[in-house]
Amino acid sequence: MSQLTFIFAAMNAGKSTLLLQAAHNYVERGMAVELYTAALDTRAGLGVIRSRLGIERGASTFNADTVFDHRILERDTACLLIDESQFLRPVQVRQLHRLAHTSQVPIRCYGLRSDFLGHPFAGSAALLTLADEFEEVRAVCGCGKKATMNARLDATGARVSAGEQTLIGGNERYIAMCPRCFYLDSAGEQDAQSTAA
């Protein structure tokens, strides 16, 4: 039976690498795979999924208007892989859940669970509600512990505790942190206090 799977982690855990490896595994066996990534993430170019290891592959893009239904699948699609799935809208997650169960094509969504303030992305919250299976990928904090939080940095490398939820960036803009380091950091303490108020 096909299902919707949410593979999540903090920044820099290797989610895109795992997606590209999964795509390779299907292709190596002679199977067709469909890849999607968020149109707003153009760090590697529009419609390109690139890992920090340097491997990349072209992909279709999704935006807020994309409809995920049977029309997006080729006749012989063996699996649908979606990168940056935190940017999906809840209605799109519902469409993907329906598609997985009516098309018999497994759908694997890779993304962040929460933003730089520790708040859920709408797409991730919907995936945590509807996905049939979950896989957490381990990221590592600078202290060596498991990182589950994301911290945003400004151009000077200082921690940011306010701003828009979505700001595309890589290692120069975000770091993964364990909860202890996230909250002990001065900006994290300010955010925790403002969230509690």
Swiss-Prot record:
**What keywords is this UniProt entry annotated with?**
ATP-binding, Cytoplasm, DNA synthesis, Kinase, Metal-binding, Nucleotide-binding, Plasmid, Transferase, Zinc
Family affiliation: Belongs to the thymidine kinase family.
NCBIfam families listed in its UniProt record: PRK04296.1-5 (NF003300)
Q: Where does ATP bind?
A: 9-16, 83-86
One Pfam match, given by its short name, reads: TK
Q: How does it assemble?
A: Homotetramer.
Instruction: Tell me what reaction this enzyme catalyses.
Output: thymidine + ATP = dTMP + ADP + H(+)
Annotated Zn(2+) binding sites: 141, 143, 178, 181
Primary location recorded for the protein, binned into one broad class: cytoplasm
Q: What is this protein called?
A: Thymidine kinase
Which residues catalyse the reaction? 84 (proton acceptor)
Can you cite a GO biological process for this protein?
A: DNA biosynthetic process
> What Gene Ontology terms describe what this protein does at the molecular function level?
ATP binding; thymidine kinase activity; zinc ion binding
InterPro entries per the UniProt record, alphabetical: P-loop_NTPase, Thymidine_kinase
Taken from the UniProt entry, a GO cellular component term is: cytosol
Could you read off the lineage of the organism from its UniProt record?
A: Bacteria, Pseudomonadati, Pseudomonadota, Betaproteobacteria, Burkholderiales
- Determine the domain of life of the protein's source: Bacteria
Q: What EC number(s) does the entry state?
A: 2.7.1.21
Give compartment(s). Answer: Cytoplasm
